């Protein structure tokens, strides 16, 4: 991650000048300010909001920054963030959550997250999905929770939807049910495809054609349960 010194070196100015550009830009000449701002953009520098530390103080615990995309809407998603915090504390780490919503500017939220200088990142979402990863996140150790990266090779911790559905349908068929109603998440959800694979595997192992069952796909959230 770029430092204040990197910006100063690229702009060919002093550290004080960079500091003034960030905190008191009106005190600089327009051409100097423009040069510093260009260097900040080129180095992807993010100001350090946690820099006010007493010199010589004991090292503070390491910190995990949790970037939470649409994960404050259900008990399941809240449980994810609470579990992260509890596990971090068990190992002597701190954690903080930065919420991001679909209409937010990702670059702005990521810059705010990184300005707190976390030692690592957990990117979590509500509902299993594939996500694009802002390049700045990959300047730190980063893992994904309940989501997968579209392009980058990043460790992901996700539910085993295929195996879970397989076990559930297998148990149902073992009780003698041969015509269960199959209620699915919306067809375009990533978890839907994997759960359908588990269902089909369990049915075929039991000699049952899954295509003969009645399948209904949710269209607009929980309201579809009432329709059925």
Per-range role (PLM):
Residues 1-2, 41-75, 91:
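N-terminal helix-turn-helix/winged-helix DNA-binding helices
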Residues 66, 117-125, 181-184:
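Periplasmic-binding protein-like
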Residues 36:
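Short conserved active-site loop signatures built around small residues
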């Amino acid at each position: 991650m770029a430092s204040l010194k990197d910006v100063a070196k690229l702009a060919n100015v002093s550290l004080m000048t960079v500091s003034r550009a960030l905190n008191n830009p009106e005190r600089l000449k327009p051409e100097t300010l423009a040069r510093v701002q260009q260097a900040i953009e080129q180095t992807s520098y993010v100001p350090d909001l946690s820099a006010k530390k007493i010199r010589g103080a004991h090292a503070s615990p390491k910190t995990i920054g949790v970037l939470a995309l649409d994960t404050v809407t259900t008990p399941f998603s809240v449980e994810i963030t609470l579990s992260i915090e509890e596990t971090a504390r068990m190992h002597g780490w701190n954690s903080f959550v930065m919420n991001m919503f679909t209409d937010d500017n990702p670059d702005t939220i990521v810059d705010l997250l990184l300005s707190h200088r976390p030692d690592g990142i957990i990117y979590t979402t509500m509902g299993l999905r594939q996500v694009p990863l802002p390049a700045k996140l990959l300047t730190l150790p980063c893992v994904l929770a309940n989501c997968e990266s579209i392009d980058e090779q990043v460790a992901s911790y996700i539910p085993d939807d295929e195996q879970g559905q397989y076990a559930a349908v297998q148990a149902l068929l073992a009780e003698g049910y041969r015509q269960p109603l199959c209620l699915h998440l919306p067809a375009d959800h990533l978890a839907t495809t994997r759960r359908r694979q588990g269902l089909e595997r369990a049915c075929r192992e039991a000699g049952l054609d899954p295509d003969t069952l009645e399948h209904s796909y949710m269209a607009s959230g929980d309201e579809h349960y009432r329709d059925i």
